[in-house]
């Protein structure tokens, strides 16, 4: 049995920025962070240099330290401003990257607080691990990683593991592959262990039992390989779901 990671209210509250979990997760990336980090580096160097030479009474070096500090302060402020500007557009970013409406983005964000929502992909001990996490709510799937990618569960046709995902360099990698209800809506979570893949797939399956979770399967006497037959598998899912809705 795959254990789902259900957080309590206090734990979920810690995964929010300005009252939003998706904004909190979106803030994991951005050019502003790089600028601010560079600014802090200059500040540390400048302060260390100033402290070192001020006791030695070297006016020229003291000025050099001060000159290093000022650009550092400016970079920190500029980085914070750029990051705030980026984070402000989180709703639009999720909508555009996911191909869903902004109303869906806001609904998914609200469902994070639902008691049935399972958090997936909290791996590693770095401070941004939770920001890179995903979650499966009653109606939505936020894909783990730094990209603002959301699926409506009703739009997920397949979510399966493979150890034969072909990378850009021609090698193979372990991955969770996610198909939407059209061939263009596909996502891969690459370099994921089988155990971690099972965590993600198990959460999706629990919330949406109709999703295909096996790479290879048989239906009506025909064998399918979801990795090699993406369009056929998506078409099969749409046909079966269409028949069940009638």
Regions of interest found by a model, annotated:
Residues 1-32:
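Cytosolic juxtamembrane N-terminal segments of multi-pass membrane proteins
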Residues 141, 150-166:
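Phosphoinositide-dependent membrane-docking surfaces
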Residues 128-137, 149-151, 178-180:
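Short, exposed beta-strand/loop patches in secreted or surface proteins that constitute
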Residues 92, 150-154, 186-192:
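Short amphipathic beta-strand/extended segments with alternating polar/hydrophobic composition
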Residues 160-246:
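Acidic, Ser/Thr- and proline-rich intrinsically disordered linker/docking segments
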Residues 2-5, 80-136:
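Anionic N-terminal interaction surfaces
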Residues 25-87:
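Alpha-helical transmembrane spans
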Residues 26, 142-144:
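Short beta-strand segments that buttress and anchor functional surface loops
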């Amino acid at each position: 049995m795959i254990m789902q990671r259900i957080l309590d209210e206090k734990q979920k509250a810690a995964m929010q920025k300005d009252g939003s979990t998706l904004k909190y997760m979106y803030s994991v990336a951005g050019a502003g962070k790089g600028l601010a980090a560079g600014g802090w580096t200059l500040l540390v160097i400048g302060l260390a240099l100033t402290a070192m030479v001020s006791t030695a009474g070297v006016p020229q070096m003291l000025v050099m330290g001060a000159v290093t500090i000022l650009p550092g302060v400016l970079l920190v402020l500029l980085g914070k401003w750029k990051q705030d500007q980026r984070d402000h557009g989180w709703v639009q970013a999720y909508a555009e990257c996911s191909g869903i409406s902004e109303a869906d983005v806001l609904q998914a964000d609200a469902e994070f607080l639902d008691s049935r929502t399972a958090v997936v992909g909290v791996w590693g001990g770095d401070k941004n691990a939770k920001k890179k996490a995903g979650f499966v709510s009653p109606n939505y799937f936020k894909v783990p990683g730094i990209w603002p990618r959301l699926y409506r569960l009703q739009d997920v046709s397949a979510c399966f593991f493979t150890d034969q995902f072909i990378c850009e360099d021609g090698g193979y990698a372990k991955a969770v592959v996610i198909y939407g209800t059209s061939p263009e809506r596909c996502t891969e979570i690459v370099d994921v262990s089988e155990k971690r893949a099972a965590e993600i797939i198990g959460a999706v399956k629990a919330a949406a039992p109709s999703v295909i979770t096996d790479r290879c399967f048989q239906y009506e006497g025909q064998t399918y390989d979801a990795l090699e037959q993406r369009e056929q598998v998506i078409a099969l899912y749409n046909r079966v779901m269409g028949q069940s809705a009638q």
